[in-house]
Amino acid sequence: MIKLVLLRHGESQWNRENRFTGWHDIDLTENGRNEAFQAGRLMKEAGLVFDMAYTSVLKRAIRTLWNAMDSMDLMWISVFKSWRLNERHYGALQGLNKSETSRKYGEEQVLVWRRSYDTPPPLLEKSDARYPGTDPRYGDLSEAEIPLSECLKDTVERFLPIWHETIAPQLRKGKRVIIVAHGNSLRALVKYLDNISEEDIVGLNIPTGIPLVYELDDDLKPLKNYYLGDQEALKKAVDAVAGQSKA
């Protein structure tokens, strides 16, 4: 049996302020750092050990990985960072408060932008200061690879190449892997692993800082998955994510 652990980054400052974050490189709050340490403790208590980690190029995910591995005394493991694990790009919504945006456009429209499979938010202009094309961490990407906005379908399409070409082969070699990423990049992977329909993925919410363990067969098909930790706290965390766009 193969185990894979998925971990959404701890609470960021913009999570706390209920803003659309996307590719903006905001850091963790003190609570978010504590969530990451606690995630590490939960994984250590569960007997989990890792050989390698994959994360995005955004500091909230990187710092979550650092803190979790520090808690597990695994700071030495190999870490691979890729833009393909970034949060989905929220286009012109990045930086806006979710509740205020719901009051302006309506909760139903904002829910479509946040959770539908194939409807992206309004596009960002390349002249906008938020456009990531001038960021050196994306200097090796072609202009076509740098998004102006993304729906979940777009996020799935950019995530799956690194899954098929890099992560899955390591799992098949017996490597013990953790992926520390973002709400929507992890939703993209969960959709693929669990073969969730485009309609049902709307209702899937992934909380910050709580490890999600997948047990996979030799073909990397899920046998079961489960979150570590207190289940009542988990329910509250999932409900909190679901309620973020209420006006």
UniProtKB/Swiss-Prot annotation:
User: How is this protein named in the record?
Assistant: 2,3-bisphosphoglycerate-dependent phosphoglycerate mutase
User: Does the keyword section mention Isomerase?
Assistant: yes
One Pfam family in the UniProt entry = His_Phos_1
Q: Where is this site: Transition state stabilizer?
A: 182
Described function: Catalyzes the interconversion of 2-phosphoglycerate and 3-phosphoglycerate.
Q: Which family does it belong to?
A: Belongs to the phosphoglycerate mutase family. BPG-dependent PGAM subfamily.
Keyword annotations for this protein, in alphabetical order, are: Gluconeogenesis, Glycolysis, Isomerase
Swiss-Prot/TrEMBL catalytic activity: (2R)-2-phosphoglycerate = (2R)-3-phosphoglycerate
Entry annotation: catalytic residues: 9, 87
Keyword tRNA-binding among record annotations:
no
Superkingdom of the source species: Bacteria
Q: Which GO terms describe its molecular function?
A: phosphoglycerate mutase activity
Quote the record's binding site residues for substrate. 8-15, 21-22, 60, 87-90, 98, 114-115, 183-184
Organism (species): Chlorobium phaeobacteroides (strain DSM 266 / SMG 266 / 2430)
* Family annotation (InterPro entries): His_Pase_superF_clade-1, His_PPase_superfam, PG/BPGM_mutase_AS, Phosphogly_mut1
Class of this enzyme: isomerase
Record EC number:
5.4.2.11
Q: Which gene encodes it?
A: gpmA
Q: Which CDD domains match?
A: HP_PGM_like (cd07067)
Q: Name one GO biological process term.
A: gluconeogenesis
Pathway terms, separated by semicolons = Carbohydrate degradation; glycolysis; pyruvate from D-glyceraldehyde 3-phosphate: step 3/5
